[in-house]
Curated annotation (Swiss-Prot):
Species name: Allium textile (Textile onion)
Family to which the UniProt record says this protein belongs: Belongs to the universal ribosomal protein uS7 family.
Primary location class: plastid
Protein name: Small ribosomal subunit protein uS7c
InterPro entries, sorted: Ribosomal_uS7 (IPR000235), Ribosomal_uS7_bac/org-type (IPR005717), Ribosomal_uS7_CS (IPR020606), Ribosomal_uS7_dom (IPR023798), Ribosomal_uS7_dom_sf (IPR036823)
Amino acid sequence: MSRRGTAEEKTAKSDPIYRNRLVNMLVNRILKHGKKSLAYQIIYQAVKKMQQKTETNPLSVLRQAIRGVTPDIAVKARRVGGSTHQVPIEIGSTQGKALAIRWLLGASRKRPGRNMAFKLSSELVDAAKGSGDAIRKKEETHRMAEANRAFAHFR
């Protein structure tokens, strides 16, 4: 039996202005080269732009966007008898949120536009409405899992 203790699960901290964990998760994912103040600046500008576009609470739009993009199921490569199968697996809520944030940021980086705050706000508003690149990525993942449903017993 191992003598190592189990690591305590870290709880996500809240951001200083909105006191929201999702905003903090977004900040930590957009972070590049340790420039956290710039990451906060981009996120807060994006939230302001979302407020102007939708004229509703921007945090509810953010929650709705992340809920819309969060996948329930994904595929994982599993090697069985010399061939690799894409095995569908269920995703937990924390991992799903992390994937959703990664997809939203990736989709907003690919968008044409002036700056990251503008692109991110546009992607979040689109995702909340049920369109956009991140939603397409989620649907693609679900289709892939559905197509490989026959391999679910390899789990």
